[in-house]
């Protein structure tokens, strides 16, 4: 049991919450340049070729970012925006690429959930 004198000398310290997305440094998004665009396979029991890219951010961090949606136009030296959000079946992938901003195009022929994939509303 701690005495009051001990608490006066050294107060209780708060636990510091560890960020899930340290490379963003508290920002909602960060800009970066693709250094490598490739596919990788998920953990068991899933099976696919997930599209990911290695990104060098403006703050010097180098992170792996997932490219969502069907098809993309990214290649080396593309400038993209990333947001937080991990991919559960890809170890080490803690960021998502934002579609429809900077050099990353929106998903072609997307009709539903368009805002998540950078697609404008179609004219009737």
Swiss-Prot record:
UniProt keyword list: Methylation, Ribonucleoprotein, Ribosomal protein, RNA-binding, rRNA-binding, tRNA-binding
Coiled-coil parts of chain: none
GO biological process assignments: translation
Modified residues (3-methylthioaspartic acid): 89
UniProt-recorded Gene Ontology molecular function terms: rRNA binding; structural constituent of ribosome; tRNA binding
Recorded GO CC terms: small ribosomal subunit
Pfam families: Ribosom_S12_S23
SUPFAM superfamilies: Nucleic acid-binding proteins
NCBIfam families: rpsL_bact
Function noted in UniProt: With S4 and S5 plays an important role in translational accuracy. Interacts with and stabilizes bases of the 16S rRNA that are involved in tRNA selection in the A site and with the mRNA backbone. Located at the interface of the 30S and 50S subunits, it traverses the body of the 30S subunit contacting proteins on the other side and probably holding the rRNA structure together. The combined cluster of proteins S8, S12 and S17 appears to hold together the shoulder and platform of the 30S subunit.
Family per record: Belongs to the universal ribosomal protein uS12 family.
Subunit structure: Part of the 30S ribosomal subunit. Contacts proteins S8 and S17. May interact with IF1 in the 30S initiation complex.
Name the UniProt record assigns to this protein: Small ribosomal subunit protein uS12
Source species of the chain: Baumannia cicadellinicola subsp. Homalodisca coagulata
């Amino acid at each position: 049991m701690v005495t009051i004198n001990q608490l006066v000398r050294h107060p209780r310290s708060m636990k510091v919450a560890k960020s899930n997305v340290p490379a963003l440094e508290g920002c909602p998004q960060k800009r970066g340049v693709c250094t490598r665009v490739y596919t990788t396979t998920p953990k068991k029991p899933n099976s696919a070729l997930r599209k990911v890219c290695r990104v060098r951010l403006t703050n010097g961090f180098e992170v792996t970012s997932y490219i969502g949606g069907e098809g993309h136009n990214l290649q080396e030296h593309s400038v993209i925006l990333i947001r937080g959000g991990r991919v559960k079946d890809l170890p080490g992938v803690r960021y998502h690429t934002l579609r429809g901003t900077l050099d990353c195009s929106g998903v072609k022929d997307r009709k539903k959930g368009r805002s998540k994939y950078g697609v404008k509303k179609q004219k009737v």
